[in-house]
Amino acid sequence: MIATIRVVVTGAAGRMGREMTRGLLQTEDIAVVGAVDRREVGVDIGSLNGLPPAGVIIQEDLAGVIASARPEVMVDFTVAAAALANARLAVEQGVSPVIGTTGISLERLDELHQLCEARQVGAVVAPNFSLGAILMMHFAEEAARYFPRAEIIEIHHDQKIDAPSGTALKTAELMAARVNRPLTPSPAEEKVAGARGATYQGLAVHSVRLPGAVAHQEVIFGGQGQLLTIRHDTTSREAFLPGLLLAIKKVRQLKGVVYGLENLLEF
């Protein structure tokens, strides 16, 4: 008999929250036992997602949901400040957070890691749950060893509130750590402020926000007489479900915070 993992979703009425909840409700070994959001309060989470009623209504009080529903894992798709508050509350109750929210600083992640270790609870924080995007970051990390310069262009829908994306920042961090030396952008005089994008870990990072986009990123490497472009396109949020399921199924085996889905994969 397959063991069922009890999950509460925070940010359940948002774009990502709804898409992931729909997938979780249709996954055999996952039981969505709670849903938290300030929107759509009192609405059945199944009905909200075009599925048969699930018997789980959206509530505002995470502490109350944890106490009554007894989840093992909390999946969070809110915003950075709320995600951290939710994660701290969950960890204190022995519930393992899986956080897909971006914009959380490394300092705050370290604080969460210390709390998780003290409570002997695992957590996963992943800027991107798409397995294809994780492979894109891995390939970029390896390519950074062989090219003197690179730039990142990330494209997202116009409702995304943070820039650069967590995926772009994570990619830059991986590349800089892989080469173990400062990366330097090409020198250029900006005739218009910001024309060369933001600089992070020595890489120029360009953020595009347009209607019609979902999540896209390319890393362009330049060397003598050649360019290498590594690109990943997410055309539907369904792409995030397999990675999310992987994190949910592994997080209870961890102690402390694992940052990045790539650390749950075998390369």
Swiss-Prot record:
NCBIfam families with a match to the protein in the record: dapB
Function comment: Catalyzes the conversion of 4-hydroxy-tetrahydrodipicolinate (HTPA) to tetrahydrodipicolinate.
Positions annotated to bind (S)-2,3,4,5-tetrahydrodipicolinate: H157, G166, T167
Reactions accelerated catalytically: (S)-2,3,4,5-tetrahydrodipicolinate + NAD(+) + H2O = (2S,4S)-4-hydroxy-2,3,4,5-tetrahydrodipicolinate + NADH + H(+); (S)-2,3,4,5-tetrahydrodipicolinate + NADP(+) + H2O = (2S,4S)-4-hydroxy-2,3,4,5-tetrahydrodipicolinate + NADPH + H(+)
Entry keyword set: Amino-acid biosynthesis, Cytoplasm, Diaminopimelate biosynthesis, Lysine biosynthesis, NAD, NADP, Oxidoreductase
Domain of life: Bacteria
PROSITE patterns assigned to the protein according to its UniProt record, in alphabetical order: DAPB
SUPFAM superfamilies referenced in this protein's UniProt entry, alphabetically: Glyceraldehyde-3-phosphate dehydrogenase-like, C-terminal domain, NAD(P)-binding Rossmann-fold domains
Protein name: 4-hydroxy-tetrahydrodipicolinate reductase
Residue numbers binding NAD(+): G11, A12, A13, G14, R15, M16, G100, T101, T102, A126, P127, N128, F129
Active site residues of this protein: H156, K160
Residue positions binding NADP(+): R39
Subcellular location: Cytoplasm
This protein's encoding gene: dapB
Enzyme Commission number, as recorded: 1.17.1.8
Gene Ontology annotations of biological process type: diaminopimelate biosynthetic process; lysine biosynthetic process via diaminopimelate
Entry GO CC: cytosol
Species: Moorella thermoacetica (strain ATCC 39073 / JCM 9320)
HAMAP family linked to this entry: DapB
Pathways per UniProt: Amino-acid biosynthesis; L-lysine biosynthesis via DAP pathway; (S)-tetrahydrodipicolinate from L-aspartate: step 4/4
Name of the top EC class for this enzyme: oxidoreductase
